[in-house]
């Protein structure tokens, strides 16, 4: 009996030892798996930052700096992979899903910064269709990059499929207990992290993790926080909170300038506004000489400059300011009002002129869905939008409709209209990139010490400027023969994407403009020509440099109209400020105020400006009756 008890006891000790050994093995295996997942997370975050920053030292500095959240980002990726592995039921399978979701946007962001100044924002995916439409142009400009991208995508798909098959067959399975433990560990931490990422709310924990939302400077936001966290911070940018102090009483306290008694107009002049794509004065470039002058007409008539809030693209944001008299400075950085915010009727020059009995028409020789223009122009009150879909076929210069053919179409439509009209036209010929063989013959000679590729780009661009200038002269010659007063306004939407032409000539340090800098630098990188001309009174001079938001003030003043908002309120702001940019104010006297939005107190006129804009775009529209009565009457009548 004693021998039996001894045998049972020995067997129990052996079983306990075997169980302990198995637990140790499982624990060691789990630790190895977690460590490997952590290494994948580190490698993935490092790869993403190298791609976006395009700098090995800068990426190393990002990881080495204890004041930046590189390791917080690694922790988030680590937790995400643990959670996804638990869902799939196999170790490390999450890496095959998360890696491309992280690396592909990083590559897109790096490529975006080749053409524009900004990194990739979540809102950029709202206009993916626009990018695909322009893809042939981009491919033509950078064919080897396109070949590399396509080859890389094919290789990535093939490798991904092979890895997925290998993972499904060979990656270790997770037990039910292991899956539950991973979910229980990762999910609460990920949810907690997500809840502290609202940049509108201060978070002590987020601050300790070194995640600092820098919404007023997105370049610094991405540099400090890294691509993944900065991108995540920007996810709620479509939500616009009311500015502090916004309420009905605040709107009621904004004074309305009384309209002059018995205001008369000079026979209701016709108004044509031309926003010329990428139009700029290339003779500003140092170290080069262009002969003959590509823009003699505009140079003679130019009365000032528009300070564009954009560079090399994002035309719709400039257009938004020009038509509404509102400012991008009061909207989240990186937002695109045409894509995100214009969902309901908004006051604009179109509604003003329609209220005065005008035909109000938008004209653009491209597809109406681009930049959501069909819906936006309807919300702005245009009674017609003539686009590529419903206009006669346009003659092309390169792959875009020519300025000459668009001008002829404007003249044709104007001649058919008996009532006074307001036409807003957006040209297309000047759109970049500027491939060497766009035109069969360039008539502008480029002299100077430039690489041949840059010389060809500049010659192509200068030829487009010349043809835009010729088209304006054609329109003016037609207007001079008209009895009714005709006002023509032309301005460029932004500087062209000339890429290395800027750095080769020394005009800019890089190939894209800076978002912040001294006043002279900002003006050099954001000023485009402005012409305000009447067939009865000639050109308006000494306008200076103004934001697009003040164009409505200039147009109505030139036409002899008064309005509570466009000439009254904006006129009051214009009396003090000429440029209203997110990072800089330029006063009437030419003095600049940097980072004005970060000051403890914003000037009262700009505070009220923000209140009125928010009220009409996002708020309760308390200001409608006092500032935009004609807009309200137009829409109440169902027009």
Curated annotation (Swiss-Prot):
It is a multi-pass membrane protein. It comes from the Bacteria. The keyword Protein biosynthesis does not apply. The chain crosses the membrane at residues 34-54, 69-89, 96-116, 144-164, 185-205, 227-247. It is found in: Cell membrane. Keywords: Cell membrane, Membrane, Transmembrane, Transmembrane helix. Its main location: membrane. The keyword Transmembrane applies. InterPro entries: Alkaline_phosphatase_core_sf, OpgB/LTA_synthase_biosynth, Sulfatase_N. GO terms for cellular component: plasma membrane. This is Putative cyclic beta-1,2-glucan modification protein. It comes from Rhizobium meliloti (strain 1021) (Ensifer meliloti).
């Amino acid at each position: 009996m004693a021998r039996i008890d001894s045998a049972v006891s020995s067997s129990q000790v052996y079983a306990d030892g075997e169980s302990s050994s198995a637990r140790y093995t499982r624990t060691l295996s789990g630790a190895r798996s977690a460590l490997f997942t952590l290494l994948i997370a580190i490698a993935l975050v490092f790869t993403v930052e190298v791609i976006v920053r395009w700098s090995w030292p800068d990426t190393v500095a990002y990881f080495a700096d204890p004041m930046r959240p590189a390791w917080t980002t690694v922790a988030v990726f680590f937790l995400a992979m643990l959670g996804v592995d638990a869902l799939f039921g196999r170790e490390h399978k999450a890496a095959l899903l998360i890696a491309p979701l992280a690396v592909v946007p990083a590559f897109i962001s790096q490529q975006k910064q080749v053409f524009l100044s900004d990194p990739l924002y979540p809102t950029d995916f709202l206009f993916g269709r626009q990018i695909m439409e322009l893809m042939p142009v981009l491919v033509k400009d950078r064919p080897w990059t396109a070949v590399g991208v396509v080859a890389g995508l094919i290789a990535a798909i093939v490798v991904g499929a092979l890895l997925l098959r290998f993972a499904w067959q060979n990656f270790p399975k997770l037990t039910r207990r292991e899956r539950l433990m991973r979910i229980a560990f990762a999910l609460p931490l990920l949810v907690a992290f997500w809840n502290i990422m609202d940049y509108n709310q201060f978070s002590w924990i987020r601050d300790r993790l070194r995640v600092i939302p820098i919404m007023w400077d997105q370049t610094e936001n991405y540099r400090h926080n890294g691509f993944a966290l900065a991108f995540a911070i920007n996810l709620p940018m479509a939500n616009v909170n009311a500015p502090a102090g916004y309420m009905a009483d605040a709107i009621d306290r904004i004074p309305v300038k009384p309209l002059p008694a018995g205001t008369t107009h000079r026979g209701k002049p016709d108004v044509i506004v031309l926003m010329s794509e990428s139009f700029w004065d290339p003779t500003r470039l140092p170290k080069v000489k262009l002969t003959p002058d590509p823009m003699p007409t505009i140079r003679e008539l130019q009365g000032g400059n528009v300070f564009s809030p954009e560079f090399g693209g994002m035309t719709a944001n400039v257009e938004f300011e020009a038509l509404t008299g509102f400012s991008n400075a009061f909207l989240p950085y990186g937002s695109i009002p045409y894509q995100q915010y214009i969902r309901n009727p908004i006051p604009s020059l179109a509604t003003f002129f329609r209220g005065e009995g005008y035909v109000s028409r938008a004209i653009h020789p491209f597809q109406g869905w681009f930049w959501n223009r069909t819906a936006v122009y309807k919300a702005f009150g245009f009674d017609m939008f003539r686009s590529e879909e419903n206009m006669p076929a346009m003659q092309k210069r390169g792959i875009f409709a020519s300025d000459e053919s668009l001008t002829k179409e404007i003249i044709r439509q104007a001649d058919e209209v008996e009532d006074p009209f307001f036409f807003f036209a957006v040209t297309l010929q000047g759109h970049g990139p500027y491939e060497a063989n766009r035109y069969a013959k360039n008539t502008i000679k480029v002299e100077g010490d430039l690489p041949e590729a840059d010389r060809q780009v500049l010659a192509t661009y200068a030829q487009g400027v010349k043809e835009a200038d010729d088209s304006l002269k054609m329109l003016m010659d037609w207007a001079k023969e008209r009895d009714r007063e005709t006002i023509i306004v032309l301005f460029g939407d932004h500087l062209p994407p000339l890429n290395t032409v800027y750095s080769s000539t020394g005009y800019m340090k890089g190939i894209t403009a800076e978002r912040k800098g001294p006043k002279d630098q900002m003006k050099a990188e954001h000023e485009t020509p402005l012409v305000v001309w009447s067939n009865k009174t000639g050109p308006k001079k000494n306008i200076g440099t103004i934001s697009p938001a003040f164009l409505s003030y200039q147009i109505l003043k030139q036409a002899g109209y008064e309005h509570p908002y466009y000439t009254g309120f904006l006129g009051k702001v214009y009396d003090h400020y000429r440029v209203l940019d997110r990072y800089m104010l330029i006063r009437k006297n030419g003095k600049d105020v940097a980072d004005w939005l970060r000051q403890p107190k914003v000037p009262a006129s700009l505070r009220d400006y923000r209140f009125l804009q928010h009220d009409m775009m996002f708020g309760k529209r308390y200001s409608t009756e006092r500032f935009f009565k004609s807009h309200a009457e137009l829409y109440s009548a169902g027009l």
